[in-house]
Amino acid sequence: MPYPFSISPHDMEEHLVQEDKGPVLRFITCGSVDDGKSTLIGRLLCDAQLVFEDQLADLRHGGIRGGNGEEIDFSLVLDGLEAEREQGITIDVAYRYFSTSKRKFIVADTPGHFEYTRNMATGASTADLAVILVDSRQGILQQTRRHSYLASLLGIRHVVLAVNKIDLIDFSEPIFDAIVAEYVRFSAKLGFASVMAIPMSARFGDNVVSKSGKLPWYQGSPLLEYLETVELDAPDRQEPFRFPVQLVMRPNADFRGYAGRIASGKIAVGDPVIVAKSGLRSSVRAIIAPDGNQISAAEGEPVTLVLADEVDVSRGDMLVDPASRPFVSDQFQAHLIWFDANPMLPGRSYLLRTETDSVSATVTVLKHQLNVDSFVREPAKLLQMNEVGVCNIMTQRPIVFDAYKENRSTGNFIIVDRVSSATVGAGMIDFPLRRADNVHWQALDVDKAARSALKNQKPAVLWLTGLSGSGKSTIANALEALLHTCGKHTYLLDGDNVRHGLNRDLGFTAVDRVENIRRVAEVAKLMADAGLIVICSFISPFRDERRMARELMGEGEFIEIFVDTPLDECARRDPKGLYKKAFAGNIANFTGVSSPYEAPENPELHLKTMGQEPARLALQIEEFLRSRMEEK
């Protein structure tokens, strides 16, 4: 007997394919809070006799405990967590699979709360169809528009508009027609291939599995029948072969295979393949599946490929069809959905992960934000939680990808915060930027080592960070004078001075502060490449940007120096009168007052300035630098 499971989507689909080689329909349910999404899926499974009797008994017990009397609370089929039951909401995406005599299904129940839109995006990323629920009493709401837009953005082509709780409006045809007309009107801009509207009552089962006698005016199919028979995209639109290598298999010296799951397309013994990044060519000599050798394999299958030639292939490479190669680039345009409570800041360094790559990346340009309610492009300097933007992204090294609209498997990515390791965004790649192909590194005969040898010194970047008024500039100035007397070649980059020229166009918002440090770090890198000892005196309040600066430099070149002066002392000194203005509310985004300062957690040098003369602190830095240089 078929029954619902709660396991990962990949494992579900593999299990279903092994049961029967027929296609699987992957769909999501989404809508506003309390529209009845979990109740609908629970009713669907129960009425289709896909829930065991002992599970039904548990549901009856849960219904009584939940205050619902003897009536079964079908939402509890999916809402398995105690916290969910107590709060009466679905907290995260719940995956289940089931099958009928006509089709097999994977369903994702996604939350309707505004702050959980990211989970809806997770559920939609692999779905073929979206069941979007609408409360017949409330009609089309903001979340209906939001979820419809995200479904379209994430590549879903087919929609069922489930007008639920039809019993609460006395099965009214005019109200149903008005809701459908409004939805069709606004969704016409979203490019869905089909929209099927079904009036239903998930609570009482009307038009869920069986056609309801209470809706004689409705001539269409009930939900389950429609899901069993809906025609999806034509199978002749075959996506090209993409095989991310997850593991190199070397059980002995005579065998070398490449294990992974086929992301898209199909492959057969004898087919030519190419390593996407290197361009090395070969052909498939053997395909090894869990049950043994086979002649061919297709999307979703875990296999080990053995190649006919000895080519350099490593974990993270991608084997592809030579006739339809993916893009390999370090710059591209993408649609980005932001998940995190902390905003996305252009210029900040994040981790970007794809099927094959994990690489440092920066949003170089936020072109605009997309209003998911009105579909209007709006100017923006950052993205807040649940917002969608179109941006240019640059990665530290080239990555392999397809356009998302052509291949969802290899056209998506996630953004990870470098500090917390939390997933903070997800994106869909539109196209590579031509500039990436037109700009190349010029080979130079004189390198950093030659320039450093000429100066008889090793380059370094001394990065002084601390609050305004902490003494950074005074110490930095004394340090440069000291190094100059020692015959060292230096340059001092000061936070105020660079804002008179290079960064004169930047303000003091979080976005501009990030860009300020990005530019300075790049300049410091060039100066270090020239063989100089670079002294940087900047508040640089954010750890992420200081980490970015460190990663730009050579190993051991970056020395973070925390100029630690208490806020009260900085405010007392107030050499430029800025604290007085900030405390009076006349300066916005002032570090330490109205904008945060993230102190270094593990600096190379921690200078506590209270009771110390700047010259003595400068000497302390010089001594540290000298000892560091002697170690190299």
Curated annotation (Swiss-Prot):
One of its GO terms (biological process) is sulfate assimilation. One of its GO terms (molecular function) is ATP binding. Residues 109-112 are annotated as: G3. The keyword Nucleotidyltransferase applies. Residues 31-38 are annotated as: G1. Coiled coil: none annotated. Keywords: ATP-binding, GTP-binding, Kinase, Multifunctional enzyme, Nodulation, Nucleotide-binding, Nucleotidyltransferase, Transferase. GTP binds at residues 31-38, 109-113, 164-167. It is an enzyme of class 2 (transferase). ATP binds at residues 466-473. Pfam families: APS_kinase, GTP-eEF1A_C, GTP_EFTU. InterPro entries: APS_kinase, CysN_GTP-bd, CysN_II, CysN_NoDQ_III, G_TR_CS, GTP-eEF1A_C, P-loop_NTPase, SO4_adenylTrfase_lsu. Residues 164-167 are annotated as: G4. It catalyses: sulfate + ATP + H(+) = adenosine 5'-phosphosulfate + diphosphate; adenosine 5'-phosphosulfate + ATP = 3'-phosphoadenylyl sulfate + ADP + H(+). Residues 22-236 form the tr-type G domain. Its EC number is 2.7.7.4, 2.7.1.25. The active site is at residue 540. Residues 187-189 are annotated as: G5. Transmembrane segments: none annotated. NCBIfam families: apsK (TIGR00455), CysN (TIGR02034), PRK03846.1 (NF003013), PRK05506.1 (NF004035). In the C-terminal section; belongs to the APS kinase family. Proposed to provide activated sulfate for transfer to Nod factor. ATP sulfurylase may be the GTPase, regulating ATP sulfurylase activity. PANTHER family: TRANSLATION FACTOR. This is Bifunctional enzyme NodQ. It comes from Rhizobium tropici. The gene is nodQ.
